[in-house]
Amino acid sequence: MSQSLIVALDFPGKQDVEQFLRHFEGEELFVKVGMELFYKEGPAIITYLKEKGHKIFLDLKLHDIPNTVKSAMRSLASLDVDMVNVHAAGGSSMMKAAIEGLEEGKQEGKERPICIAVTQLTSTSEAMMKKEIGIEKTLEEAVAHYAKLTKESGLDGVVCSTLEVPKLREVCGDEFVTVTPGIRLASDDVNDQVRVATPKRARELGSSYIVVGRSITKAENPLEAYKTVKQQWEGVTV
């Protein structure tokens, strides 16, 4: 299950990434590259990480008209990334176009990247969703609606809170991928995410993948922190 632990490389540039990865010589990680790092370094950072043997979740949360998303996904698939995402709010046509682009752009002999959709950001509270976004549903209802739309559109799963996983299993089935950010060790601050959980709790609730950032990247000893998270996630008693 260690490959289902994704480390968020939330750094401003390649130099910071290189410094961080020195702690992990010989480890093949599954890493997340987000907007800040990708927009600074471009596709070269993907090439660098692939050459190091790491799997990559390219977290750009595409949300645009279908043709634009299709073309963008074609380009991203050609980079040999392992996972990408879109905003479910972009609608079914956009999500279907994303899959088409990934199929067209994937490298010969390889499967297309896993494609998931963001239902609601983990920084979104129900009050914010209703007052600012204008969705007159409960947060649980809105997430379930987007997850169902995502599955019907042919995507593999969603980004969601761990707390939403059991409901989404009911709505979309056990094969539906759930990628859960907002994972913290019990001793950590929650920072800017409202809906958070520990690795142990994520495992108990049935998450497919967990995304862990600051608990590892800001630790005094990142490798030891990684091992701690991994043990909790895998249910290993030491």
Curated annotation (Swiss-Prot):
Biological process according to GO: 'de novo' pyrimidine nucleobase biosynthetic process; 'de novo' UMP biosynthetic process
A molecular function GO annotation: orotidine-5'-phosphate decarboxylase activity
PROSITE patterns: OMPDECASE
Reactions catalysed, as given in the entry: orotidine 5'-phosphate + H(+) = UMP + CO2
Keywords: Decarboxylase, Lyase, Pyrimidine biosynthesis
InterPro entries in the cross-refs: Aldolase_TIM, OMPdecase, OMPdecase_AS, OMPdecase_bac, OMPdeCOase_dom, RibuloseP-bd_barrel
NCBIfam families: PRK00230.1, pyrF
Stated role: Catalyzes the decarboxylation of orotidine 5'-monophosphate (OMP) to uridine 5'-monophosphate (UMP).
PANTHER family for this protein: OROTIDINE 5'-PHOSPHATE DECARBOXYLASE
Family that this chain belongs to: Belongs to the OMP decarboxylase family. Type 1 subfamily.
Record note on quaternary structure: Homodimer.
Protein name: Orotidine 5'-phosphate decarboxylase
Native source species: Bacillus cereus (strain AH187)
Organism lineage string: Bacteria, Bacillati, Bacillota, Bacilli, Bacillales
Chain's gene name: pyrF
